[in-house]
Curated annotation (Swiss-Prot):
This is Phosphoribosylaminoimidazole-succinocarboxamide synthase. Belongs to the SAICAR synthetase family. GO terms for biological process: 'de novo' IMP biosynthetic process. It is an enzyme of class 6 (ligase). It comes from Haemophilus influenzae (strain ATCC 51907 / DSM 11121 / KW20 / Rd). It holds the Pfam family SAICAR_synt. Pathway: Purine metabolism; IMP biosynthesis via de novo pathway; 5-amino-1-(5-phospho-D-ribosyl)imidazole-4-carboxamide from 5-amino-1-(5-phospho-D-ribosyl)imidazole-4-carboxylate: step 1/2. PROSITE patterns: SAICAR_SYNTHETASE_1, SAICAR_SYNTHETASE_2.
Length: 290
């Protein structure tokens, strides 16, 4: 599957790091998940075969499983309702028909464990996004409770920046910030409890929310995939280590050790790293959904 996925009968209205959006009408759009991979906010040249299909299956699983917590972007339409059969056949496993929503202008990140940028902030200040944490935590420590740590939503190619909850309130308003925080933590908590029963620890994740035409907060984009989350295996988890993950952390770790300056273009990722990444995505899907 190539990185570009032309949908000839619909107008493309947006191309993101991984997803392309096509206009259906003023209420609906088609979201197509490509095999593109981004790391450190740079889109890599090498696609990950079948990644888009696996991500779509994982997302759809979670959207359905978490539907009791809040509305989501599903319209109930099939790709066959909006595309000619020959086009729908090509992208049916990597596309969904979704509502056109007004996106909330923050990244809604929930952390249950300490790692990544959160660990760096903690080591420097003892806090993440202004939240004071207990002393003595180490890499991969389980936090006393899940925390909401928003970041700014930057344009493609720019790095998102961790912000405090007060800054989040300034950006989107206090009422909406409170709703987003409550729902994000509720979604993470239910998902993390379920994933544990399947042998997966959800270390942290990023949710995307939007408002519908009535101002209703709605879950959108992707949910709890290896692209938006860090998944660890219960079997290999140990506090004080950097646990191996089911996600693009494989590629991120390779890039971290490659000497790359994290500016585009990224170096070519070896074939064996790409294959290991595909295998990890597939393993996550199999564990969660079987």
């Amino acid at each position: 599957m190539t990185q570009q996925l032309p949908i000839l009968s619909l107008k493309k209205i947006y191309s993101g790091k991984v997803r392309d959006l096509y206009e259906i009408d003023d209420k609906r759009m088609l979201m197509v998940t490509s095999d593109r991979l981004s790391a450190f906010d740079v889109i890599l040249d090498d696609p990950i075969p079948r990644k888009g299909e696996i991500l779509t299956q994982i997302s759809n699983f979670w959207f359905n499983k978490l539907a009791h917590i809040m509305p989501n972007h599903f319209t109930g339409d099939s790709v066959y309702d909006v595309l000619p059969k020959e086009e729908a056949d090509l992208i049916r496993d990597r596309a969904v028909v979704c509502k056109r929503l007004n996106p909330i202008k923050i990244e809604s990140i929930v952390r249950g464990y300490l790692t990544g940028s959160g660990l760096k902030d903690y080591k420097q200040t003892g806090t993440i996004c202004g939240l004071k944490l207990p002393e003595g935590l180490v890499e991969a420590s389980k936090l006393p409770e899940a925390i909401f740590t928003p970041s700014s939503k930057e344009e493609v190619g720019n790095h998102d920046i961790n912000i405090s909850y007060a800054e989040c309130e300034k950006l989107i308003g206090a009422d909406l910030a409170a709703q987003v925080k409550e729902k994000a933590i509720a979604l993470y908590t239910v998902a993390a409890e379920y994933a544990l029963t399947k042998g997966i620890i959800i270390c942290d994740t990023k949710f995307e929310f939007g408002l519908d035409e009535n101002g209703t907060l709605t879950l959108m984009d992707e949910v709890l995939t290896p692209d938006s989350s860090r998944f660890w295996s219960v079997d290999t988890y140990q506090a004080g280590t950097n646990p191996p993950s089911f996600d693009k952390q494989f590629v991120r770790d390779w890039l971290e050790n490659s000497g790359w300056n994290k500016q585009a273009p990224a170096p070519k990722v070896p074939e064996n790293i790409i294959q290991k990444t595909v295998d990890k995505y597939q393993e996550a899907l199999d564990l969660l959904t079987k």
